[in-house]
Amino acid sequence: MSKRTFQPNNRRRAKTHGFRLRMRTRAGRAILASRRGKGRASLSA
């Protein structure tokens, strides 16, 4: 039997999909801008 692929880890989640990571690149800032435009309740992990 193989284990489940999703092994929750808050630190890894923040480091790979977090707000500060999104702000780091131009593309990431574009993602945040589009999510703000859509009116998302949460912008990032």
Curated annotation (Swiss-Prot):
Identification of the protein by name: Large ribosomal subunit protein bL34
InterPro entries referenced in this protein's UniProt entry, alphabetically: Ribosomal_bL34, Ribosomal_bL34_CS
GO molecular function: structural constituent of ribosome
UniProt entry tagged with the keyword Ribosomal protein: yes
Gene Ontology terms describing biological process: translation
Gene3D superfamilies xref list: 1.10.287.3980
Assigned protein family: Belongs to the bacterial ribosomal protein bL34 family.
Keywords: Ribonucleoprotein, Ribosomal protein
GO cellular component: ribonucleoprotein complex; ribosome
Keyword Metal-binding: no
